[in-house]
Amino acid sequence: MRCPYCQNADTRVVDSRLIGEGEQVRRRRQCPSCGERFTTHEAPELVYPRVVKSDGRREAFDEDKLRLGFRRALEKRPVATEAVEAAVRRVCKRVSGAGEREVAANVIGEYVMEELRELDVVAYVRFASVYRRFEDVGAFREVIEGLEQHRRDDD
């Protein structure tokens, strides 16, 4: 890797560590020419399928949009940022790992709901109310009853 300070074409790795859930590598490098040290991060470049919206439009998968959806649902909830990032990574991995050229937006929505159900039930209900376009209290009741059943099944 080229040194960002002196542009020397050769640098050496001083230290390597896995970060996150082992999906990124942090490397400390040193330039033998100028002696400067710098940090690099390596992560796999995932190829995501196109997202097919409910009206038939197709758009590129957007990890930032996914992250924003999680953050909106989890706003003012006691969930660690690391837990949210891990959930985002799991959804991204499922989307890219399917090996499909296209994925329906509702499939991604279901992945998000599965993650939110485990992270925070209030956020799950918030997300479900928007995602499934609740129009009455009965829809909320059905989701809450489903949550209670899921909890009983886990016990």
Swiss-Prot record:
Source organism, top-level taxon: Bacteria
An annotated GO BP: negative regulation of DNA-templated transcription
Zinc finger (unnamed) boundaries: 3-34
InterPro entries assigned to the protein according to its UniProt record, in alphabetical order: ATP-cone_dom, NrdR-like_N, RNR_NrdR-like
Required cofactor(s): Zn(2+)
GO MF, one annotated term: ATP binding
Keyword vocabulary terms for this entry: ATP-binding, DNA-binding, Metal-binding, Nucleotide-binding, Repressor, Transcription, Transcription regulation, Zinc, Zinc-finger
Cofactor binding note of this UniProt entry: Binds 1 zinc ion.
Protein family according to the UniProt entry: Belongs to the NrdR family.
Protein name listed in UniProt: Transcriptional repressor NrdR
Species for this entry: Halorhodospira halophila (strain DSM 244 / SL1) (Ectothiorhodospira halophila (strain DSM 244 / SL1))
